[in-house]
C-alpha cells in the first residue's frame, strides 16, 4: 500500500495559469485521445468560459498534454498528473487512465467565477483499487428520459466509475424495444397506476409508461463507451415479469 506522500506531492514551483492561449495536446493519430482532449476543452469552457484549442501534441509550453505510456502506471486505469508552471501532463498506461486523469483536473476547476484560473504545482499518482466501479439506474419502476440518463453517465464519469448498470425491466414496466415482440412495449411498458409511498393498496390512479427504442439504447451505450463506461444491461428473468 502507498502512503499519501507517494500519491500526492506538492511542488516548489509557480502554478500553471489557464488562459485563452492554452492548448490541449494529444498523441497525433490517436482518435480516442483526440476525443478525450475535446471533452476536456468542453469541461473548461463550460466551467470557466475559457476557450482552449485542441491540437496534436508538440510539447510546447502553456499546454495540457495527454501522454500515452504503457509502462507509466501498473494499473491499466491508472494515471499520473503533473502540474508545473510550463504545462500540465496527464500520463496514462491506457486511454481510459488518461480520461480519468482529466476528470481529476476537471474537479480542480473553480465552481464560481474567478479572474485567474490557476492549478498549483503538484504530482499525483492515482489508480483504482477495484476493477468494477459502477452505478445502478432502475428505469423499470420509474422511467427516465435519455437526456437524464446522459447527465447520469456524465456524473458517473466525473467520479471515475466504469460501469453503468441499466435496469431495464421489472414488474412495473418493460422499457426496451424488441422488434420481434412489439407487445412487450405496446402493453408491457405501461401500467394503469403507481403505488403511493410505502402503504399497501394505495395507488395514484394515473396511467404511467415509457420505453426506449433500439436506436435510443444504442445511442446511450455509445455515449457511455465514449466516456470509458461499460453499459451492463439488466433484464429480469424468470422472476419479476408481471409487466408481460
Task: Describe the role of every protein-language-model region.
Residues 1, 6-132:
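Contiguous, structured surface segment used for ligand recognition
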Residues 1-8, 233-234, 241-244:
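Single conserved hydrophobic/aromatic residue that forms the stacking wall/gate
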Residues 60-61, 172-173, 240:
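Short secondary-structure capping/turn micro-motifs that flank functional sites
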Residues 73-236:
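Feature activates predominantly on carbohydrate-active enzymes
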Amino acid at each position: 500500500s502507498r502512503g499519501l506522500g507517494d500519491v500526492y506531492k506538492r511542488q516548489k514551483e509557480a502554478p500553471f495559469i489557464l488562459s485563452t492561449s492554452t492548448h490541449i495536446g494529444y498523441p497525433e493519430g490517436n482518435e480516442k485521445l483526440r476525443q478525450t482532449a475535446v471533452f476536456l476543452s468542453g469541461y473548461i469552457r463550460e466551467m470557466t468560459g475559457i476557450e482552449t484549442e485542441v491540437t496534436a501534441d508538440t510539447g510546447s509550453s502553456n499546454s495540457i498534454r495527454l501522454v500515452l505510456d504503457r509502462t507509466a502506471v501498473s494499473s491499466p486505469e491508472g494515471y499520473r498528473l503533473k502540474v508545473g508552471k510550463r504545462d500540465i501532463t496527464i500520463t496514462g498506461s491506457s486511454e481510459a487512465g488518461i480520461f480519468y486523469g482529466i476528470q481529476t483536473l476537471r474537479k480542480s476547476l473553480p465552481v464560481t467565477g474567478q479572474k485567474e484560473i490557476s492549478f498549483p504545482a503538484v504530482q499525483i499518482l492515482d489508480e483504482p483499487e477495484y476493477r468494477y466501479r459502477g452505478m445502478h439506474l432502475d428505469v423499470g419502476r420509474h422511467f427516465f428520459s435519455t437526456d437524464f440518463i446522459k447527465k447520469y453517465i456524465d456524473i458517473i464519469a466525473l467520479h471515475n466509475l466504469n460501469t453503468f448498470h441499466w435496469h431495464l425491466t421489472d414488474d412495473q414496466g418493460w422499457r426496451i424495444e424488441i422488434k420481434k415482440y412489439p407487445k412487450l412495449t405496446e402493453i408491457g411498458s405501461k401500467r394503469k397506476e403507481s403505488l403511493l409511498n410505502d402503504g399497501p393498496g394505495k395507488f395514484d390512479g394515473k396511467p404511467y409508461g415509457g420505453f426506449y427504442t433500439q436506436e435510443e439504447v444504442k445511442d446511450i451505450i455509445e455515449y457511455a463507451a465514449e466516456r470509458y463506461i461499460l453499459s451492463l444491461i439488466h433484464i429480469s428473468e424468470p422472476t419479476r415479469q408481471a409487466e408481460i
